[in-house]
Curated annotation (Swiss-Prot):
Protein's organism: Periplaneta americana (American cockroach)
Protein's name according to its UniProt entry: Kinin-1
Entry-linked InterPro entries: Kinin_peptide
Family statement drawn from the similarity comment of this UniProt entry: Belongs to the kinin family.
Pfam families, per database record: Kinin
Length: 8
């Protein structure tokens, strides 16, 4: 879950 996506 990388921080650039909506879930991370």
């Amino acid at each position: 879950r990388p921080s650039f996506n909506s879930w991370g």
